[in-house]
């Protein structure tokens, strides 16, 4: 029951219903790793690779075009993740366009961005800040991690 309320809170059930009513497949939800760049080195991170801070991100123009295409397809929600999405200087533009296209917008961040940077993205519908624990908790104790 709680799960239904949470899903309804993000409009996902509504989007799934629309997909079924339209009798065609559309990407109702898109999770987009908008950048591989990150300012942290968390041992458990799936994007912790040697090339993560050297890979090229899509240009602003291409990223905006993808949002336009997702909107044209009927996408209801877009979730920006990464790396650390707040490292993209154009993130507020991407969020603004998605909101203009009536998409719900979610963002996952490590919370290390400046207050000014956070203010530029406050119009997202959901901002999730990863808080993984204290420094002592974060130390691997039962396995060996080799980057």
Question: How does the language model describe each region?
Answer:
Residues 35, 47, 81, 108-109:
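Ser/Thr-centric signal marking residues that sit
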Residues 49, 54, 140:
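Conserved catalytic-core motifs of eukaryotic protein kinase domains, centered on the activation segment
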Residues 48-51, 133-135:
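Short, histidine-centered active-site or binding-site loop motifs used for metal coordination
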Residues 60-80, 88-147:
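Radical SAM/AdoMet-radical enzyme domain recognition
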Residues 1-49:
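N-terminal pre-core extensions flanking Radical SAM catalytic domains
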Residues 84:
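Conserved G/P- and acidic residue-centered "switch" motifs that form tight phosphate/ATP-binding loops
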